[in-house]
Amino acid sequence: MGSGVPRPSLTAREMFMAWGRILAGNVPMLSIEITRECPLSCPGCYAYGDQHLGGGVTLSKLNDYRGHALVDGVLGLVRKHKSLHISLVGGEPMIRHRELSRILPALSKMGVFTLLVTSGVIPVPPEWMKIPRLRVAISVDGLPEHHDIRRKPATYERILKNIARCDVNIHWTITRPMLARAGYLEEYVAFWSGRPEANCIWMSGYTPQIGEQSAEMLTPEDRAALARDLPELAARYPKFLFHPGLARAFLHPPKNPRDCLFAKMSANYSADLKSRVEPCVFGGNPDCSQCGCAASTGLHWVRGVKVAGGLRVDHFVGSSVRFGAMMSRLRSRPAKPTRWTPSSPTRGTGDALVQIES
């Protein structure tokens, strides 16, 4: 039941809407790991890494919520930070599908854009497709020869059954083994472009931690080849969202979290709804020089877009962050965005938001 009109998870127009939130001293985006539970055991999964939450505790050891406590907790965080966009991740968020059936309509009524990221291991209710401002993204990492091994039991067969009569985004994390066979990338894009359930396809490159050595990691040559070849695929398959501007941003990612617009504009909570994921959604010590995050890449491109004369989005964001920090200090808000305070620490589990710097 796909509409045939590709819709990214967050558009440039929605980013401009976030400007007012920043000026008011609020963080425009939230990411919440709404459960510690997941039936998958994916190689390289950052969420369950020992350093994901700074080394003191792991996601699987946190006390998470369910029922009314989870519903109230998620909605409470959104009200607290007055965010425009929220990503609900995990763990496997569909483990809490009963709570999501209450959370998602409530977020929509609050005017919040929601991206729900799931493996597709649990059926997605078709009635959710009628919820305004909701997008559901299914993580499909390669063709069955790789995906069904990496992400079992969320196999292709199971995903296709569980997204029937739905309208979803397909999120694809590209790893090095997928580049070993000629034609692999186009075969993937062609398959999902032909599925009526797929509204659009967006990709990330595998992002390693500093010092990591794994089979999933892309080499500099791999990244250059992807930046060259993927825009050509997107030109032939309109559902695949990857234009030359994104290719340039992918090839030259932000140097560090302080240079990353996505890291600046997002506060990230783990499953206890208190612990913070720092310095970005990956947690731990991500190797920014090899970042492949779709959100980071997209916003890294957006920051260079000209909006008035010679001024770019980045000029407005930098000035807005400084103004928002001042407004937050004047109001002495308990939930002020401490990432906007240069002297604040970048990791912590208290009530202060992640540190945002321009």
For each feature predicted by the language model, list its residue ranges.
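Radical SAM enzyme [4Fe-4S]-AdoMet core and its adjacent flexible, acidic
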Residues: 57-58, 110, 134-267, 272, ...
